[in-house]
Amino acid sequence: MNYHTPSSFSDASTIAAKSTGQIRFLAGGTDVLVQMRSDILTPDDLIDVKQIQGVKDITQNNNGSWTLGIAVTGAEMSEHFEFKKAWPGLVEAADLIGSTQIQGRATIAGNLCNGSPAADSVPAQIAAGATVSITGPTGERIEAVENIPIGPGKTSLKKGELISAIHIPAREKHSGDAYLRFIPRTEMDIAVVGCAVNLRLENDSIVEARVALGAVAPKVLLVEQCSQAILGTKLDEEALSNLSAAAENACNPISDKRGTKDFRTNVAGVLAARAAKIAYNRAQGKSDE
């Protein structure tokens, strides 16, 4: 195995593009190192990106948007007061990834690149309207987060490409987000269903909404029908019922030891309504209490 410590994303991309074997990028390492120690994975080229400038930075830009380095951990997001205030749902999602120790190492960039349909932070990123910078052999491009996962363990990243930054929009006035999941245990488990909602209000009516569902399909879903179900409403009971129905209709889950298809589908409808209520209250400036 060759171990690389590039000083730039361009160098990292070049190494990956030239590799003739299996490659892995290393930031938090909470998955790749476990796989290596368990002899599940032995990459030919392990590319450690932690020496690249800016990978640990959380930066608020002049327009209020945010840029997250790809080695920023969930714990670091949670400890950043202004970011947590702006995007509590996204931070809550990151806070659910593993144990306290894992949260001190795991990154939401890695959570995205794993391609897991049950990844906690990915629905929240999608609901937020996050995009990523991707560096590759032909330069840099911007892509919406919802276009990165394409199936279990698979992403749309091409050979030699890696995510070089995550971009989160500015928090608009009278808007809020939330993330909820269902798990069999009280903590440290994989989501049976996850749901993130981000919405904006004008005169208490919803004028913008994004709803994302996790663990109910081969990849995390951005569900336009859920958004349409609540647009123009003040999230009354009829709107919540329509939202739940739209969430259920979007589901195409598997049955496994953690939940049947029917159970996951039902829970998706319940979580969508609950997450929407929390996001709506936050958009109104109300406390979560």
Stretches found by the model and what they are:
Residues 1-289:
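C-terminal structural segment of proteins
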